[in-house]
Amino acid sequence: MYKLYTPKTATAETPVPGVLLLHGYQNDHETCAAYAIKLARRGAVVLCLDEYGHGSTTAGLINRGYVNHKVTVNYGEDSVEDGTFKTIGGQTRYKVMMNFSNLSFFDKHYTTDADGNSMTDSSAGGSYAYALLAAMDNVDPARLAISGHSMGTWSSWSVAANFCGTDVEPKAVVLQCGELFRDSAYDAANIHFNNVLLLQAKYDEFSYFRDYKNVVDDELLKSDLRTEFLGCTADEAAWNTTYGSFEDGTARRMELLNTNHRLTTHNAHGLATALTWFSDTIGLDLTLAPTDQVAMTKEALVLIAMLAAVASLMAVMELLLTTPFFSKAVQPLPGEASVKPNGAWWRGAIITMLLAAATYPFMTQLGHGLLPLPENIFRMTVGNGFLSWYLLLILIMLVTSIIGYQKNKKRGAQDGWQSMGLGTAAASGRMGWGLLGRCALLVLCMLAYLYVLLLICEKAFLLDFRFIWPFFKTFDAARFGQFCVYLPVFALFFILNNSKIMAPARCKATYLPGFKGFLGCWWRNALMMVGGILIIVLIEYIPFFMNIAPGADLLFGSTFGGPFMSLLILFVPQVLVFSVLCTYTYRRTGSVYVGALTAASLACWIVTGGSSML
């Protein structure tokens, strides 16, 4: 799957430059939109690809290939003797991810193993896309370039190596948060890379994009690896300075950006630098200044559309609740006598937040690569991280809920299940299975409505619901199957989570009508839902912004940094939106089911709709 941007000036009679854009891990072709729009507005044909395992591509991530070893420093700086070249075992997805930076054109010492495994296509489909772009009659084959972000930078290196020495070899490579390697890692005598620009994020959460150093500073700039790349001495090395010659393809530059890993794709400084680089290498028309950038307007409008679509779910719910069948999903709230004192609520809230913070870094990474799951069933890589975390929290919540229920029963409480948001007023002494089923049908109708809206948006505008990164996309059969696999665990987690948060968070505001009552409930619910994650945000970024190191790397080791730390920028806003939906639906229906099932479905949709699949 790809998206092609073609300016009106591109014809067979007047061919124009062509650029292949390759997205990063957990993203898709639409994440490249900022670069694509800016390049196309300046006269280039731009092809944005869904790489293996991402977006709508049917080939899984496993098609990149893998071997049974990994390198724990930059390639070409490793050795068996010092332990930086290691044999690995475990789950296939772990081996695949440990070989992201192992590239197909590296020496066989790296790309094959004794078990017959190999790196088959580290371009992740990029080479096929590049060949397609080069063959277009409105593209000048002498003016081709590549740019990739994160995982896409390894694909970019691979495409450039594959077409080196051909009539269509790329004249420039722009790496958005890329890893470097020594010339000794590959056949440097026969493989060369023309005019390489590295956009370096100062606060990159991934250690391999910082050369496994704690921070990005001048010491990193002057390392042997970096000076070899620039073609200069340590004394000559400087940020934001071009070395070499564009004419012979030796131009090199490292641009330091004051941003983090994920935001590099839309960083104005980086975009302007890249556009100038493309002008110098493939003749991109800069009549429109590099600083004239409109892509964020598109992102803002799509964000508004997504939020409006999600908010309209509440209107659909209200409409459905007026029908005789769904009106029975509305229950009265438990009596005010069961409201917890403020002190007891704060103790529970603090415990909840600390528990989430203590388990998030470990369980997400454990599930990401090491948890022994059937990989032909559980194929979502980041999804497995959340699955692992949710499973642990489910066990904890089940135990504490059972203990709490038994205590209430001994005290003679009459509204046990209703008090937890799980039962009806008519039969508060037992689980409300009928209520659950009715609420599930209600949520199914709401989701069907949202899917139709999304389908219209995709067909009419070639856009899904997102903000830079993929959120809601239409499903193919494989991804819908994954949605069905993960949804039961997500649903159980959110039902228990809302039962532990919404019901105990009842306060005087719960019984107040209108916005004042909603706000008085929401801030408590939001704090408990997102507070633990905010603790992790502070732990990760305070020492990082102080130029010490990412907090996760300092406290837990670099194994627990990277993907799930960089995900926090997406995860926190998602949870805040879920807290609004869950608070509103709990106050409206008197049970946790509608809010929990809605949040679970949306969260599962985000994880399975377009992100990485093995």
Regions found by a protein language model. Give the residues of each.
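Soluble extramembrane regions of membrane proteins in the secretory/endomembrane system
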Residues: 1-294
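Conserved serine/cysteine hydrolase catalytic core
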Residues: 184-193, 307, 317-324
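Cytosolic-side membrane-insertion boundary helix
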Residues: 285-313, 321-346
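C-terminal membrane-cytosol helix-exit motif in multi-pass small-molecule transporters
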Residues: 310-322, 403-404, 494-498
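Contiguous hydrophobic segments
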Residues: 315-336, 567-575, 601-608
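Alpha-helical transmembrane segments of integral membrane proteins
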Residues: 350-614
